Amino acid sequence: MNNHHVKQFIKQGLMRLAPEVAGVWQSARERRHIRRFEQRMGLTELKRSYLTQHELSVASGPFAGMKYLSESVCSALVPKLVGSYEAELHEIIAQALEAGYTTVVDVGCAEGYYANGFALRLPSVPVYAFDIDVQARRLCSAMANLNDLQDQVTVAGRCDPERLNVVLTGHSLVICDCEGYEENLLRPDLAPALAQADVLVELHDHIRPGISATLQSRFRDTHDITLVTAIDRDPACYPGLLFSDPADRRLAVSEFRPAHQQWAFFRAKTGNAAA
């Protein structure tokens, strides 16, 4: 057994026997990888430069005005501050903000861009934010405090289908970005409340091949399905960017996603959604 197989064997064993420990180990490893990538691509210096020229808040998009932190978890910070982050989803998010949800659940919340953003825009709606990464939970709580949302946003660790089923009440929205774990989590057979919930999930076929087809087959009978594919950003759409160098402007709105990255929005069919 070579070193790669040994590492895979240990990882699989940890995920099976001690998923929380495995999650912490995996998150720490991913953070180290991202730090090296950011330094190599010039993103570390770009972030410093951005923070000296712009306010520490979201400049545009559905969560414009939200106060932010000077760090992020396993994703680029500057696109979130610019307001270009996951711009492909802005139309869906705008619709979601008008949908009358009674609960929002964010699994894989990181520092809380979506959890706190939805809480800010839906002040009477409870938001549950889950992440296995200790640093993510700390930052999500800190951002909730920064925006005076601490009584509205509940931050917790691991979320399994049983826990998800408990927190889904009324007309709920589930936001899911958990690096392939969505295949384990989004199980209507184990969480029947998913049949009445709307679900916005980032798909990770590059981690678990076939996951898109699996999830679509689970929700096809109860939900209308919309697939959204990632596209490149045009910095000209964000006039608030103060960088003069065109290369820096492009870098500021880049998210470095895998080719053909997709999201799925599962909207509960009329008559199936909770009242």
Model-derived features with residue positions:
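Class I SAM-dependent transferase core
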Residues: 52-87
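Conserved alpha-helix/loop element of class I SAM-dependent methyltransferases that forms part
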Residues: 83-100
